[in-house]
Structures are given as structure tokens and as C-alpha cells.
């Protein structure tokens, strides 16, 4: 806009997209609301973050409250390890919640026809201008679409009336309505209201989708601050910069007193308006008072709707006040900066000066906090992914064919698992591991043996067999006392001690503890009865030619551990002639020796040999 076209009744404001630099727009809005509120009656355009400020100006939202909201969002972004890139930080979600709170119920009616928002259609990247809204939700959706930066704010673009849109700055970052549009940008360039950057003499610049940006050092800093928020002090200076730049523009257009006039400290005592003016500028709560006070300070000032050519300078103005820009370094802008705008920054600085923030100021604590944040970043990513999936499932109802596919897949996996289970036998193999010393000798513990002996649980058949064995031992002791059994008795073909030891239940337990089992197999038969199968070693070949040789095997086979003896199952029909040694089967802690056909019972066992032998002579646990 040129000075020739600076007619206030025709001026339209246009706020460019700038990310977290929208605090600069807040300073510009504060100056306009205080010194030129008539500019808010026309159209206001905005892209990205500029659309939020434009909506606040039209709906009459308190600028101080809006600034507090901006600082709140910045504080939450800076508290994360990776700032706004942290997966738990939802920028658009926070902005949406705040807009739903601060906007009045009829905001969409106030913005219809006056608020112009620049959008970029996701399908073809064409610019779309929106100025009609059906509800507050419709208005907020348009603002969210204009603020969405791909990958920075998310992956899926938001929708406005069923169509996906992204940041309006991608196609038009500085929307222009007509030649009377006043452009506002936080970047130094050719915009009407922008930082002048007096200390830079760069004449080079770039046009970013309608926004003029000069190649200056400060602009590089501002570009980084767009997406990565700065400290509270930096944001305070940016807001003050916007207030001063807007006030300078209004002064050039004759819509506000000269900056130098506002800083005059001595006013004629005969002019009562001077005292009222200083009081009003210190309070700054009523924009109408400020406008009313500024008129008496002028010798002959036209109204705000008059042309700039009819404007007369104030009594204390010099010849160059209205024709040239005055550097901000030469005036004290902060002296007449509204106090209501200072309060949000003072509160934010006070919060940063707490004891916790003081502890966080130490370098070691900052490094430790950063390291912890980086270490738990993968867990935060996983949690954010789960939340996104949950939100997607809540919003999108999967079709029936997808549910059937997943159900079929689950049934297939479960069926394969059951098939794999059936291929394996459910058994447990126990291998005895004996403790030895440095010389290889087995270490025996009488205490542990007694405890293990107590822990043996016998089945009903084993208990009956144990009673039978004890009854036989009792009979042998009675015969021994009566003198009917002697070592020289011709009827006794066995050594009395060896027969007693081999056939006794205690000897069976001692034998199993002193000899390591090569293999012990526990299984259940078709009747779900637990059975035991064991293999032991034998040192000598034991032929089945005579009963005396078999008896000799009973005496000496228990001490050797050099030869493996195969033990057939109970249902195996293995011929005895094919086996070179008697099978030794251990069931429930007992040893049973299979005799050959030529073997005969000597009658000294105490058991009736004429009694029919049961089919399963083994003892089971």
C-alpha cells in the first residue's frame, strides 16, 4: 500500500503466516486497537498463524489473554526434550482447545464476510480463500487447516467441509484483498508493517509466497524462531517490536500521534489535556480515551476518516516527524507500551524464576534432563503411535470384510498352534546329577537322604508291595531267631545278607541313591496312570543258565557301573534268549529281576511261588 492509497475507511489488514512469531502480530494488534480501532471495521485477512490473530481482532478477544495463550503454548513446547517435535506435543490440539474457550458463541457470524483465511488444497496445492462460516466449529476447522504444516504438525491433513487442506502459507502466505491492503509481517522486507532492521544494509531479499524477506542476520534468527519457540525475553522483545512498528505506520498515516510527541515529558501547564494524556497512556484500558485525548494536543487535526493530505502536524512536531521513520533506539517505546500487555510477560518471567527453574538453570541438571528425555524418547514414540491408532479406530469403522479377514487369520494361527502341540509328547525326563568332590567321588549326605526318603510318595500298589516286603522281612527274622535258616543250610542257596539286602525295600532305595540312573522316563498310560521307566548300568554279563548264577548276580551286580543294560517296556515281547543280561526295571523305587525259564525259586523268599503271578509285576508310583 502506498501513502496515496492510505484512506482509513478503505484499509484492510493482512497478517502473514509466521508460526510462533505470531507474538509480533499481537503487538501490532495492541497498537491498532489502542490508536486506530476504526481499521478493525473492514476486512482482515490472514494465513496460518496470522488467521488466529485476525479472528481475535474481529471477535474482540482480549489481546492480553491471547498473548497469555501464546506464551502458554510456547512454554509447553519448550518443556519437551525435542520441543514442538516431541510426539506428545500436539500443537493444533492445544490451539483448538484454546479457541473453543476464548471465542464467543456468535464468532462465526462476526467473521462471516470479514475474516478471509488463506488455505492450500492438499490434492492439487491450489490456493483457496474462505470467508463464510456456518458455525464456530466450521470457523475453527478453517483456522486449523490454515495452520497445518505437513510433517511438523502431523501426517494426515485436517478437513474443512470434507476436503483436506494444509497451511495457507504454502500457496499464499500474504493474502491481498485490494490495493488498500495493509500487509503485516514479522520479517524485515517491503511489508507495510515490519521490522526495519536499521543496522543492516542488505538490499537482497526473497519473496516467499507474497511475503517479502530481506537477507539479514535478524531475519535468519526470525526464520528459526518460527518453528522453534524462543525464550520469554525474546518473545517480549518481538511483541514490543511489533507495537513500535505498528505505531510508526499509524503515525505516518496520520492515525496516531507522532512517536516523538508521545515521549514528550514537559507539556505546557496551561494545557490540562497534558495531564490527562499522561494518565491515559499509563492506564491504557480504554481505547476511546486515548483517541479522545490525542486530539487536544493537535493544533488542528482532522478526524481519523479524513485524507492524509488534510492532516496538520501537532504543536510540538518537527518538519521530519511525519515524513521519515524514527529508529526505535531513539525513543522509549516501552514507556507507553500498554501495561495490560506487559502483564502476561511479567507472569511468564515470574514463573521461570521459581526454585525449580533455578535448579534447572545449572548446566549439569540440564544435561541430565536432556539425557533422560532422549533415553525415554522411543517409549514416547511407541505411546504416541498407540494413541494415534486408537484415535484412528475410534474415528474409522472398519468394514465387515476386514473384520472377517482378521478373524480368519486368527483362527488359522490358533489352529496351527494346536497342530504343533499334538506333534510333541507330553513327558518329562529326569536325569540324576550326583555331586562329586575334586577327586570324582560322590558326596553323600545322610540328612538329605533322610529328607528325600520322607518325601517319596507311593501309589496304592506300591504301598501294598511295601507291606508284603516288610511281612517277608519279619518272617525271615523270626526264622533266623528260631535257627531254621543258617548260612550252612543246604536249602539256602543264597547268601543270607545279600538276599536280605537285595529284596528289602530299604536296599532298593539305597541302591537308587548310590547308583546314578542313566535314563528315567515318567509317562502316563491310556488310563492316565503315572508310570516310571528307568535304565541302570551293570558291570558283569549274567547268563541265565542256572539259578545259582542268577543268585550270584544278585550279590555282585549292584556294585558295578560299567555296562548298559537295556530295559524293555512292560508291553514289549522281547525274547529272553536275545538279552545277555537280565532286564532291570525300576518302578517306584523297587528293582525287579526277570528270571529265565530254567530258574526256580528256592523257596526262601517267603513268597508262595505257586501263586499266579500278576500281569504287571512292576511297582508304579
UniProtKB/Swiss-Prot annotation:
One of its GO terms (molecular function) is triacylglycerol lipase activity. It is a single-pass type II membrane protein. Residues 65-621 are lumenal. Residues 13-180 form the PNPLA domain. It is found in: Lipid droplet; Cell membrane; Cytoplasm. InterPro entries: Acyl_Trfase/lysoPLipase (IPR016035), PLPL (IPR033562), PNPLA_dom (IPR002641). Disruption phenotype: RNAi-mediated knockdown reduces stored lipid droplet hydrolysis during fasting resulting in retained/increased lipid droplets and there are also increased lipid droplets in the fed state. Suppresses fasting-induced oxygen consumption. RNAi-mediated knockdown abrogates the increased fat loss and increased oxygen consumption rate observed in the hlh-11 ok2944 mutant. RNAi-mediated knockdown also abrogates the increased fat loss observed following overexpression of flp-7. A motif (GXSXG) lies at residues 46-50. Pathway: Glycerolipid metabolism; triacylglycerol degradation. The keyword Metal-binding does not apply. Residues 597-621 have a biased composition (Basic and acidic residues). The keyword Repressor does not apply. The active site is at residues 48, 167. GO terms for biological process: lipid homeostasis; triglyceride catabolic process. Its EC number is 3.1.1.3. One of its GO terms (cellular component) is membrane. Keywords: Cell membrane, Cytoplasm, Hydrolase, Lipid degradation, Lipid droplet, Lipid metabolism, Membrane, Phosphoprotein, Signal-anchor, Transmembrane, Transmembrane helix, Ubl conjugation. The chain crosses the membrane at residues 44-64. Pfam families: Patatin. Residues 33-43 are cytoplasmic. It catalyses: a triacylglycerol + H2O = a diacylglycerol + a fatty acid + H(+). Interacts with par-5. Interacts with lid-1. Interacts with cgi-58. This is Patatin-like phospholipase domain-containing protein atgl-1. It comes from Caenorhabditis elegans.
Amino acid at each position: 500500500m502506498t501513502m496515496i492509497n492510505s484512506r482509513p475507511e478503505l484499509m484492510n489488514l493482512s497478517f502473514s503466516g509466521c508460526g510462533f512469531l505470531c507474538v509480533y502480530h499481537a503487538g501490532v494488534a495492541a497498537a491498532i486497537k489502542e490508536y486506530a480501532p476504526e481499521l478493525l471495521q473492514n476486512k482482515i485477512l490472514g494465513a496460518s498463524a496470522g488467521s488466529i490473530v485476525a479472528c481475535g481482532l474481529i471477535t474482540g478477544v482480549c489481546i492480553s489473554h491471547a498473548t497469555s495463550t501464546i506464551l502458554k503454548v510456547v512454554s509447553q513446547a519448550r518443556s519437551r526434550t525435542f520441543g514442538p517435535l516431541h510426539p506428545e506435543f500436539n500443537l493444533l490440539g492445544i490451539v483448538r482447545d484454546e479457541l473453543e474457550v476464548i471465542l464467543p458463541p456468535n464468532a462465526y457470524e462476526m467473521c462471516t464476510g470479514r475474516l478471509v483465511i488463506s488455505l492450500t488444497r492438499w490434492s492439487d496445492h491450489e490456493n483457496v480463500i474462505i470467508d463464510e462460516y456456518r458455525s464456530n466449529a466450521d470457523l475453527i476447522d478453517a483456522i486449523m487447516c490454515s495452520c497445518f504444516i505437513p510433517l511438523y504438525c502431523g501426517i494426515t491433513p485436517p478437513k474443512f467441509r470434507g476436503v483436506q487442506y494444509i497451511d495457507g502459507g504454502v500457496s499464499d502466505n500474504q493474502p491481498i484483498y485490494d490495493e488498500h491492503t495493509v500487509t503485516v509481517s514479522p520479517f524485515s522486507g517491503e511489508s507495510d508493517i515490519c521490522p526495519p532492521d536499521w543496522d543492516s544494509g542488505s538490499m537482497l531479499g526473497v519473496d516467499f509466497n507474497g511475503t517479502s524477506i530481506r537477507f539479514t542476520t535478524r531475519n535468519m534468527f526470525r526464520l528459526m524462531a518460527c518453528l522453534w519457540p524462543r525464550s520469554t525475553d525474546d518473545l517480549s522483545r518481538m511483541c514490543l517490536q511489533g507495537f513500535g512498528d505498528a505505531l510508526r505506520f499509524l503515525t505516518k498515516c496520520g492515525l496516531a500521534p507522532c512517536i516523538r510527541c508521545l515521549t514528550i515529558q514537559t507539556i505546557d501547564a496551561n494545557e490540562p489535556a497534558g495531564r490527562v494524556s499522561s494518565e491515559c497512556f499509563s492506564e491504557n484500558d480504554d481505547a476511546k480515551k486515548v483517541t479522545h485525548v490525542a486530539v487536544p494536543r493537535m493544533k488542528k487535526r482532522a478526524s481519523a476518516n479524513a485524507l492524509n493530505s488534510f492532516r496538520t502536524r501537532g504543536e510540538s512536531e518537527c518538519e521530519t516527524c511525519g515524513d521519515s521513520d524514527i529508529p526505535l533506539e531513539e525513543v522509549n517505546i516501552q514507556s507507553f507500551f500498554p501495561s495490560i500487555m506487559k502483564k502476561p510477560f511479567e507472569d511468564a518471567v515470574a514463573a521461570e524464576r521459581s526454585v525449580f527453574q533455578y535448579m534447572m538453570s545449572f548446566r549439569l541438571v540440564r544435561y541430565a534432563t536432556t539425557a533422560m528425555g532422549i533415553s525415554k524418547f522411543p517409549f514416547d514414540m511407541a505411546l504416541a503411535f498407540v494413541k494415534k491408532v486408537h484415535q484412528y479406530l475410534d474415528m474409522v469403522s472398519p468394514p465387515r470384510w476386514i473384520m472377517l479377514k482378521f478373524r480368519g487369520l486368527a483362527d488359522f494361527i490358533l489352529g496351527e498352534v494346536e497342530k504343533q502341540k499334538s506333534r510333541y509328547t507330553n513327558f518329562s525326563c529326569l536325569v540324576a546329577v550326583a555331586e562329586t568332590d575334586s577327586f570324582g567321588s560322590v558326596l553323600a549326605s545322610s540328612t538329605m537322604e533322610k529328607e528325600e526318603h520322607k518325601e517319596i510318595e507311593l501309589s496304592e500298589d506300591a504301598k501294598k508291595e511295601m507291606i508284603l516286603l516288610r511281612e517277608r522281612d519279619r518272617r525271615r527274622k523270626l526264622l533266623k531267631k528260631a535257627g531254621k535258616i543258617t548260612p550252612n543250610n543246604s536249602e539256602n542257596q543264597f547268601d543270607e545278607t545279600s538276599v536280605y539286602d537285595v529284596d528289602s525295600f530299604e536296599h532298593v532305595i539305597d541302591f537308587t541313591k548310590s547308583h546314578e540312573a542313566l535314563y528315567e522316563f515318567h509317562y502316563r498310560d491310556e488310563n492316565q496312570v503315572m508310570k516310571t521307566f528307568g535304565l541302570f548300568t551293570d558291570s558283569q554279563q549274567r547268563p541265565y543258565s542256572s539259578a545259582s548264577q542268577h543268585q550270584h548276580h544278585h550279590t555282585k551286580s549292584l556294585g558295578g557301573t560299567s555296562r548298559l543294560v537295556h530295559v524293555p517296556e512292560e508291553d514289549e515281547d522281547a525274547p529272553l534268549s536275545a538279552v545277555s543280561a537280565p532286564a532291570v526295571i525300576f518302578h517306584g523305587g523297587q528293582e525287579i529281576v526277570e528270571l529265565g525259564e530254567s530258574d526256580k525259586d528256592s523257596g526262601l523268599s517267603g513268597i508262595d511261588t505257586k501263586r499266579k503271578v500278576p500281569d504287571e509285576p512292576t511297582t508304579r508310583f
